[in-house]
Amino acid sequence: DEIVLRSYQTDVIIVTADGWLVCTGTYSATTRRHISAFMREYGYGDYQLAKMLYKDGMKMNIHTGEIVPY
């Protein structure tokens, strides 16, 4: 099953069943707070990591830490 952070009507972070975390954008200040809380809650890192993944067009495997192009 996927884990999805949805802010308003937008899927912002998606963690696939095989562990790939993708951030689709940073959007509004409120959404950035949601991203930060989500990353802390699930132990995936922090907002800065999600922002870096988005800006660099990358995805991260939450099981291995591998970061590859999205």
Regions found by a protein language model. Name each.
Residues 1-70:
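Terminal leader/tail segments of proteins
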